[in-house]
């Protein structure tokens, strides 16, 4: 399987394994920070997660700008070391009995903002680490499955660890995982793109940042399909949040007459479907990425329809697993398009735009769901969302066919800089 063959490349295997550990560490951090925050400040403690999400949203576009300006290896190393120090301060404060809510709010702010710099730098570095498009596709599948593995492994590890470790040392584990990630990035340094591969333009101040953001938006606008894809990403993120994040817990309680256990099973089934689809998408040769994206959306919608077609837990589990198959069909080809059809010195900005759109839409979806389910039943709400998701896939496919038949499709050609950079990256790996 091509998906597993990627692990034969030491640089990719080392990076992926370190990111799995880092993601598991993040899961432990999330458990500990919410527990301490609520224990110290009651319901006000939920502000911690809101602050972290808000920081990632506010600094998302800015992170993409600097991921394209600076040496990406240096960015990731620095961010991991800073996150290790910041998170590592919490167990020290807890040990001396000095941990307060404002400490955790500051840490959440820093972790969220630093993550918005690390993620685009990582995504923009993958084309350099992969030797060809097929390997890059498989590497994207590996990275996409990372957080899903963390969700699966995290809960199973948390219980036994709490028997032997005080909860505050979950912060310690996360800090150590950041150091492991930094060590891996240091070791694969020669495979990562040096600073001359990043943006050659240098701007100062707010005007420079706005200019770089404008350049990133222009790259999206010039692409024949990315503008429509990004609009659909917003719609899908809103509707997915309404249907799954908000709708499924209500559906399990009101229509399946079940508690948190049933909800956990449905979420688990979704995780299993995601992982299976990731393995498949990382193993096959993707000839038509746009078709895969549109098919993925239809599959997600059909899965949601299946989930609520009858008030039955087995059917809900089957529908959840089926819907999950569509996620990687959408995500992995989109990452491949960004990484191979956008000039290397703009990948960070385009990726951060995608990430910011997704996070904004999910926040909006949560707000809409709070009102929507007061006026319509949960199954009807999920059905409406499913139909909207499917319409983005069907409508997108029809739009692509129309552009191709009418001759309005603009071919995407690598820029001169893109070709030179890819050739240099391959030669540096030999």
Where do the model's predicted regions map?
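Juxtamembrane intracellular "pre-TM" segments in multi-pass secondary transporters
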Residues: 1-13, 191-231, 416-418, 424
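Helix-loop boundary and gating motifs at the non-cytosolic
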Residues: 2-57, 218-270
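Residue-level signature of transmembrane alpha-helical entry/exit and packing/kink sites
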Residues: 11, 100-105, 225, 229, ...
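Substrate-agnostic recognition of the 12-TM MFS/MFS-like secondary transporter fold
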Residues: 13-30, 51-67, 71-86, 103-163, ...
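Structural signal for membrane-spanning alpha-helices in multi-pass inner-membrane proteins
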Residues: 34, 87-94, 158, 162-163, ...
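C-terminal transmembrane bundle of multi-pass solute transporters/carriers
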Residues: 51, 58, 69, 73-75, ...
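Transmembrane helix-loop junctions in multipass membrane proteins, especially transporters and channels
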Residues: 95-99, 124, 131, 163, ...
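Hydrophobic alpha-helical transmembrane segments
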Residues: 101-112, 138-196, 261, 268, ...
């Amino acid at each position: 399987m091509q998906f597993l063959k990627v692990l034969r490349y030491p640089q990719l295997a080392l990076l992926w394994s370190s990111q799995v550990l880092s993601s598991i560490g993040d899961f432990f951090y999330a458990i500990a920070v919410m527990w301490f925050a609520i224990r110290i400040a009651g319901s006000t403690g939920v502000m911690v997660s809101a602050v972290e999400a808000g920081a990632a949203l506010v600094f998302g576009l800015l992170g993409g700008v600097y991921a394209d300006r600076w040496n990406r290896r240096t960015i990731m190393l620095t961010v991991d070391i800073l996150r290790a120090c910041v998170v590592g301060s919490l167990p020290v404060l807890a040990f001396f009995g000095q941990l307060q809510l404002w400490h955790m709010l500051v840490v959440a702010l820093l972790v969220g903002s630093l993550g918005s710099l690390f993620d685009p730098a990582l995504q923009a570095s993958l084309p350099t680490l992969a030797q060809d498009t097929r390997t890059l596709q498989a590497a994207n599948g590996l990275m996409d499955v990372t957080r899903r593995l963390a969700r699966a492994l995290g809960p199973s590890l948390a219980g036994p660890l709490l028997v032997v470790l005080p909860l505050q040392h979950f912060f310690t584990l996360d800090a150590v995982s950041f150091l492991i990630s930094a060590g891996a990035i240091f070791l694969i340094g020669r495979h990562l793109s040096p600073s001359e591969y990043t943006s050659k333009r240098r701007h100062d101040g707010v005007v420079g940042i706005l200019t770089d953001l404008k350049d990133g938006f222009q790259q999206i606008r010039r692409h024949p399909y990315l503008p429509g894809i990004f609009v659909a990403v917003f719609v899908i993120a809103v509707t997915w949040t309404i249907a799954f994040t908000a709708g499924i817990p209500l559906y399990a309680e009101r229509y399946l007459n079940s508690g948190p256990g049933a909800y956990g099973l449905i979420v688990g089934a979704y995780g299993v479907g995601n992982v299976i689809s990731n393995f498949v998408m990382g193993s096959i040769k993707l000839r038509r990425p746009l078709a895969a994206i549109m098919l993925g959306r239809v599959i997600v919608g059909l899965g949601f329809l299946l989930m609520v077609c009858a008030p039955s837990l087995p059917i809900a589990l089957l529908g959840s697993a089926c819907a999950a198959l569509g996620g990687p069909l959408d995500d992995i080809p989109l990452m491949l398009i960004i990484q191979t059809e956008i000039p290397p010195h703009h990948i960070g900005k385009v990726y951060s735009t995608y990430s910011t759109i997704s996070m904004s839409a999910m926040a909006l979806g949560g707000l809409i769901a709070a009102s929507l389910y007061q006026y319509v039943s949960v199954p009807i709400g999920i059905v409406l969302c499913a139909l909207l998701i499917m319409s983005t896939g069907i409508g997108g496919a029809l739009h692509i066919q129309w552009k191709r038949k009418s001759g309005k499709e603009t071919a995407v050609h690598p820029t001169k800089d893109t070709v030179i950079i890819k050739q240099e990256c391959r030669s540096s790996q030999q």
